[in-house]
């Protein structure tokens, strides 16, 4: 079918650019936003420069030259290769070799955390943030209070920054409970140990967890370098023991 309307060439579309020339805040606001949301990244600044040239230049061909110039700068910048690596790495992380696609996923409806320090609190937030109730266990009641207070401060900071509403904070923070007894996490589907790096301490914890939580629960350790096989061997369910090292701060860093 024939189209009755025609579309002008891009080089002839200058109404928006001309209108923006009188607004000094457009570019400054864009730079401020990029500095806040794309800290340290090179390309966003060059993209903004392209827009700035499009607004202020009268010669379309000169604008195209500027765009090509800025593109080459991005192309040779070391960040390019790193950003490409991150892009494909994030997608590859969800694909595990030799694990069939039809492998069923475990249903995680409740989680437990051992330790209420920086890592324990951050990991608890990871679960709460996706709607999974989580119970933190610590042998020291004062540490528990400090840990929960730190979590609450983190959420309040997010509210202050506009990253979540006060209602969302109340609902999410409400998913986090705490206590002093391993019996309180007997029904969790996964429990993550997040105490300091001491193998003897972790072995003691895993022996207690093996007795306390249900038989099909996953026992995980946040250890960064200790032998996970040694932790597995001290339990009656070695096939259910895994290492899950969260990068700190766990509630912010995406790397696991």
Can you describe what each PLM-predicted range is?
Residues 93-154, 177, 212:
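NAD(P)+-binding Rossmann beta1-loop-alpha1 motif at the extreme N-terminus of oxidoreductases
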